[in-house]
Amino acid sequence: MAAKKTYIVITPFFPTPDSYRGCYVYDAVRAIQRDGRYHVEVFVPKRRGDKREGYDIDGLRVHLFPMTALPSYLFNGLTFGINARSLAKAVVKAGIDPADVAVAHGHTSGFGAAALGLKRLNPEIKVLCQHHDLDPYTIRNGRLAGWLPNLSFRAHAARRAYEQIDLHVCISRAVEWNLSHFPQVNPDIDFENYNYKLRKLRGMRKTRLKATTVLYNGVDTRIFNTEGRKTEGTFRIGCIANFQDLKEHRTLLRALGKLQDRGLDFEAELIGTGPELEGCKQLSHELKLDSRVMFLAELPHERLADFYRRLDLFVLPSVFEGFGCVYTEAWSCGTPFIACQGQGIADYIFPEDANLWLASQHDADDLSDKIENYIKKRPEQRLRYPVDIDTLMRDFLDKLQ
């Protein structure tokens, strides 16, 4: 029997012994392992000068490799070549023969570009770049993101790398659209912080992509399920997200204020941290929601499923969401969700059900109407596609071969 080929995952998003950040990539790695077709190796970046070679988490060895980048994403792409060589060197140092590698799967632009260094050692390696965001060219972030020389450099650097990638993996059709049509503005997405940057690049030619596919972020249903679900007493609404402008917590709070004005009884738990948190607390106070809305900074990962199970409804009106694992995690625990139109999760909603579960962007009135409708009528939420990560990964690996 032939030895298994190696599947290398290169990602900035991965848990450590101290943090579960990036657990969705961890879940995907475990699903590939359970599938059994490949031997999986994980590479995570470290700062240059860091002497660590790796760490172990839940019996999985994670290799570290030095990566170079300028602060605040300045001229992102300038060091793609340096990092590609650094990764290739780390792979060989880890005792992995490039001839045994079948797939190099980078998560986000810089890591897809780094994976190209392995293809230079073995041209038979299939290089994948997975896009987790509605900004697949990574032009939105950084203090000087809107400065045209920086913006243009970053976009062109990403395009050069992307045209060498064998397969672009997108977590939703919305992400795939933004990737394929860049720099065209997506008419379904109303987020000016991103759209104005696209307009600055309107003269740039489209990227000649070799191939794209959609792989939805799956759920580990051994953890996220309805076992032990309990909902009783006051109607409970929940939300988990970083407090950023794109998550639209203020729209959610205004919707809750309208529900209170209509005499509806409910309580809400909003979990997360971020720059918008204090402003949201102040808005909650102004709306006289102090007795109904609770803000929690953190929730240990091991308690996440229990949080979902005690909710009646999960609501996150984000207006720039590539997918949103929290929606399908909640659903797997028996809790339906309300999101916004035009986001990645909209793929999972049947078109005829959109009026139940997808609110207009930035619209507290529409959001409050949809929450009220669920409180009063409790319609069943159906999803168009599987959420189980083993099912999704098996189908993906079938296509990959």
Q: Where are the regions a protein language model picked out?
A:
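Short alpha-helical donor nucleotide-sugar binding micro-motif in glycosyltransferases
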Residues: 298-299, 306-311
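Conserved acidic donor-binding segment of nucleotide-sugar-dependent glycosyltransferases
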Residues: 351-352, 356-364, 372-376
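Conserved donor-binding/catalytic core segment of Leloir-type glycosyltransferases
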Residues: 8, 169, 214, 230-247, ...
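N-terminal subdomain of nucleotide-sugar transferases
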Residues: 1-58
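Aromatic "clamp/platform" in nucleotide-sugar-dependent glycosyltransferases that forms part
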Residues: 319
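A charged, aromatic-enriched C-terminal amphipathic alpha-helix characteristic of glycosyltransferases
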Residues: 376-401
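A short, active-site helix/loop in glycosyltransferases that binds the activated sugar's phosphate group
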Residues: 48, 155-211
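An aromatic- and histidine-rich active-site surface loop
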Residues: 50, 80, 84, 103-123, ...
